[in-house]
């Protein structure tokens, strides 16, 4: 028999946190980190999904490029979960919680060509990095340790984003995904460019 579905606990102020911060600040930082944990968990699953569903002439290059990114992003998730626990809160990593708390839709491509997936991943990485930068701004004053963690992760995410974009850039420095705001529109733009 399946477990009965229960309401998800709301994040509360922890009973303790790290020295030099109030429990209220610890709870607020933990909430910011939970959002980032959700995003990174979603990202590493999305990267693995693309790894399994990429097809076409660039298959092997993209397939092999993604596994190290999956591993690194999964490790980033672990660091954030452990920081949440260090702050006295309880990290939540269940699929239902992630889906309930996220502010974005599921990755929208299934089996598709390498270039289409790379175009869609450009949009995905842009969103994750923009939100990580916002989290840096929110955490810096009360918690420079968390800020440093997020800065280091942002640097690694930006490197991975460059790996993706290098496939989408022409010699003049123009991205095939310029002005695309959705995964599907980015995939469509890259498909048009790759057929020329």
Please give the residue ranges for each predicted region:
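Short, contiguous alpha-helical
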Residues: 149-179
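Conserved alpha-helical segments that form or flank metal/cofactor-binding pockets of metalloenzymes
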Residues: 55-96, 167
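A structural signal for well-ordered alpha-helices, especially hydrophobic packing surfaces
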Residues: 37, 44, 51, 70, ...
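Short amphipathic alpha-helical segments with heptad-repeat character
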Residues: 27-41, 67-70, 74, 119-122, ...
